């Protein structure tokens, strides 16, 4: 139905637009022919047609919008009813054993019923429910252990702020990252693992060399330096011996290579006292002196 209405409105708007175009052309022709009175009448008719067409279009759009709104409200209501039915069927199908016994209160109020107004079927149902509640109470008392922590009677007072800001004391700092507000709120979780004691390893100490320290009063003994006396080389003495028989002269070196320091000194003293070799008679030469 909505599609047909939209098609009708579109066709009516097209017709009105065509008529407006024709009227504009006619009015322009009348102004050219200097027929002002007729042109004024045509313009007034044109204005009336425009106003009526606008009013009709507005009414049509309002009606279509209301129809859409009603459709949406109906769909929302149907969805709500459908979800409510599903929830009710789920609650009826779920057995009571699935309900957590720890969440139920330990004390249950007794059920007061008038025996005159209750049928036998309802009595059996109430008896069954009371038995179930008793069984739940016993199971909850067995499973729940008494808490060792002493609970304070007076609850902690919350800070009275306009924004109802609460400090979370058990936010781990590992979640925060780079957020400074989270770091100001969070707390580090203490690890339950026992800390290992640091083992002290024995370190090998370096051996210190003991040196005999000298007394500052006793002067240090200087090592004696050995005086090395180099032998002084003296010039070699050359002696020339002349034989009477031959005229050849022989040169005899009197210095041997293995002379000590003492022999050199003795040789120097004897060389001065001894006469020349010409005066000393040799064994090879015969003595020229006549024996007396």
Curated annotation (Swiss-Prot):
Q: Which residues cross the membrane?
A: 38-66
| GO CC aspect terms | extracellular region; host cell plasma membrane; membrane; virion membrane
Q: According to UniProt, where does the site described as Cleavage lie?
A: 65-66
**Source organism superkingdom:** Viruses
In the record, the note on similarity to other proteins reads:
Belongs to the pneumoviruses glycoprotein G family.
Q: Which residues lie on this side of the membrane: Extracellular?
A: 67-292
Pfam assignment, any one: Glycoprotein_G
Give the species this sequence originates from.
Answer: Human respiratory syncytial virus B (strain 8/60)
Stretches the record annotates as Binding to host heparan sulfate: 187-198
Residue spans with biased composition (Basic residues)?
A: 148-157
Which InterPro entries does the record match to this protein?
G_prot (IPR000925)
Annotated segments matching region Disordered: 92-161, 189-292
Q: In its UniProt entry, what is this protein called?
A: Major surface glycoprotein G
Where on this protein are sugars attached? Answer: 70, 72, 81, 86, 92, 100, 113, 138-139, 141, 199, 203, 232, 236, 254, 271, 276, 284
An example GO BP is:
symbiont entry into host cell
Compositional bias, Polar residues, is annotated for 99-142, 245-292
On the Cytoplasmic side, which residues? 1-37
- Low complexity composition bias: residue spans: 200-210, 229-238
Query: Mind listing the UniProt keywords for this protein, alphabetically?
Result: Disulfide bond, Glycoprotein, Host cell membrane, Host membrane, Host-virus interaction, Membrane, Secreted, Transmembrane, Transmembrane helix, Viral attachment to host cell, Viral immunoevasion, Virion, Virus entry into host cell
């Amino acid at each position: 139905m909505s599609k047909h209405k939209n098609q009708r409105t579109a066709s009516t708007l097209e017709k009105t637009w065509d008529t407006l175009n024709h009227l504009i052309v006619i009015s322009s022709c009348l102004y050219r022919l200097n027929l002002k009175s007729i042109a004024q009448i045509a313009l007034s008719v044109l204005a009336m047609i425009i106003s009526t067409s606008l009013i009709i279009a507005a009414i049509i759009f309002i009606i279509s919008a209301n129809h859409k709104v009603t459709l949406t409200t109906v769909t929302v209501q149907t969805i709500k009813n459908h979800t409510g039915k599903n929830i009710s069927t789920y609650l009826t199908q779920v057995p009571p054993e699935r309900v957590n016994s720890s969440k139920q209160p330990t004390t249950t109020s007794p059920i007061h019923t008038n025996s005159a107004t209750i049928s036998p079927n309802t009595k059996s149902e109430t008896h069954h429910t009371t038995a179930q509640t008793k069984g739940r109470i016993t199971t909850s008392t067995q499973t729940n252990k008494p808490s060792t922590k002493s609970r304070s009677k007076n609850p902690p007072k919350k800070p009275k702020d306009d924004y109802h800001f609460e400090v979370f004391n058990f936010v781990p700092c590992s979640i925060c990252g780079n957020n400074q507000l989270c770091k100001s709120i969070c707390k580090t979780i203490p690890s339950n693992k026992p800390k290992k004691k640091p083992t002290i390893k024995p370190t090998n100490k370096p051996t210190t060399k003991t040196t005999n320290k000298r007394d500052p009063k006793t002067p240090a003994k200087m090592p004696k330096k050995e005086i090395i006396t180099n032998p002084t080389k003296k010039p070699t003495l050359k002696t020339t011996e002349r034989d009477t028989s031959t005229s050849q002269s022989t040169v005899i070196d009197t210095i041997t290579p293995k002379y000590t320091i003492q022999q050199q000194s003795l040789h120097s003293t004897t060389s001065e006292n001894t006469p020349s070799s010409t005066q000393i008679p040799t064994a090879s030469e015969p003595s020229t002196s006549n024996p007396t």
